[in-house]
């Protein structure tokens, strides 16, 4: 039986909650002597769901680096949620200095309002993607449904957990990873579409974000397989040793979370310089190794190869360029009336 969680389709309510949270942060900054009046520079990083633990570790690393190097204290304030909803919260007034979101398209939505300068993709290395991931399966111990690849997910006795592409950037990557498999195995577009329809017919719970889907599968014990960020699957196995297994499909997609300075906010807050250093530091050796420890693939190829035991480097990975970039992909698959709406019966 399919279930779309109530908060998933109550998108406006979700956005209001995120906006209220961001406004509380803003009030704190204003009433708590602002960004600098107590001697502490504060910046806000609006990020997506599965990065919580990574940035909890990264922020103290950066704060120490900045104080040791420049003699000034920095405090990084975090906000997390579904990537699409997070982007909309910034558009609607959340006072983010930087965004670290699940996909380029979400940052482009902010750019289109003028809050982020054009050309942000080239401001940092690797198209402003300091770490990457891919999409894998998380199954229960012993893999009771014998899931090995995408075609196993369309079996009638398999319940699939994946978030909603309308609110979750990770869910968009999940969709494209599955479609990449379909493209490998079906030359005809109608057959590819039918495969996707069958897959999403097996989705029993669709949360608004990747972390919500992980909670549904791991903590609430619903479903047979979770379509997940690789880093989220790795984290789940560490948190619940012996209870879950990671299955690498034959075909997936190179998921590239993106980062950017919210230029208008950072300029108004006087944090442009700190914000730039905050994102630049993600590319340092220390930060790249930290990303790997938290299940993200370092953009530094040398460091990535050192973690060959953690990451399957032999998966056939499509890229967003294979879909004509995010603008084209959104138009074809995720906009109102596009493929996802056609195949998924709400």
Give the label of every model feature segment:
Residues 4-20:
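Bacterial N-terminal signal peptides that target proteins for export
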Residues 29-32:
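C-terminal motif of bacterial Sec signal peptides marking the signal peptidase cleavage site
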Residues 36-167, 314, 344-345:
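N-terminal segment of the mature folded domain
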Residues 46-48, 139-141, 159-185, 199-203, ...:
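Short beta-strand->loop
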Residues 129-134, 196-200, 207-208, 239-272, ...:
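Periplasmic-binding protein-like
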Residues 142-148, 167, 180-188, 265-273:
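Short helix-loop capping/hinge motifs at secondary-structure junctions, enriched
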Residues 185-250:
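Ligand-binding pocket segment of bilobal, Venus flytrap-like solute-binding proteins
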Residues 266-346:
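Extracellular/periplasmic juxtamembrane helices and adjacent flexible linkers that interface
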């Amino acid at each position: 039986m399919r279930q779309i969680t109530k908060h998933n389709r109550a998108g406006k309510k979700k956005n209001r909650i995120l906006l209220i949270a961001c406004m509380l942060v803003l009030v704190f900054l204003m009433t708590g002597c602002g960004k600098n009046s107590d001697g502490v520079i504060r910046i806000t990083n609006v990020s997506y769901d599965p990065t919580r633990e990574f940035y909890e570790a990264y922020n103290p690393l950066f704060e120490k680096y900045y104080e040791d190097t420049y003699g000034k204290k920095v405090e990084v304030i975090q906000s997390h949620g579904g990537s699409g909803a997070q982007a909309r919260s910034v558009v609607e007034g959340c006072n983010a200095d930087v965004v670290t979101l699940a996909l380029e398209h979400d940052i482009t939505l902010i750019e289109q309002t003028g809050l982020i300068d054009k050309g942000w993709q080239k401001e940092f290395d690797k198209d402003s993607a300091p770490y990457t991931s891919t999409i894998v399966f998380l199954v229960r111990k012993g893999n009771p449904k014998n899931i090995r690849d995408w075609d196993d997910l369309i079996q009638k006795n398999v319940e699939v957990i994946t978030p909603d592409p309308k609110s979750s950037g990770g869910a968009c990557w999940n969709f494209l990873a599955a479609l990449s498999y379909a493209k490998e195995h079906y030359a005809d577009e109608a057959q590819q579409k039918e495969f996707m329809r069958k897959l999403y017919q097996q989705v029993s719970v669709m949360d608004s974000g990747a972390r919500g889907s992980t909670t549904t599968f791991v903590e609430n014990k619903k479903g047979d397989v979770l379509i997940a960020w690789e880093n989220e699957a790795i984290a789940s196995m560490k948190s619940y040793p012996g209870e879950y297994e990671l299955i690498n499909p034959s075909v997936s997609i190179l998921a590239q979370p993106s980062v950017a300075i919210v230029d208008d906010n950072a300029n108004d807050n006087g944090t442009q310089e700190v914000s730039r250093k905050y994102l630049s530091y993600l590319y340092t050796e220390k930060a790249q190794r930290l990303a790997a420890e938290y299940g993200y693939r370092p953009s530094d190829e040398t460091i990535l190869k050192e973690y060959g035991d953690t990451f399957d480097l032999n998966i056939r990975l499509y890229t967003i360029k294979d879909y004509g970039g995010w603008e084209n992909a959104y138009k074809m698959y995720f906009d109102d009336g596009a493929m996802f709406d056609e195949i998924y019966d709400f």
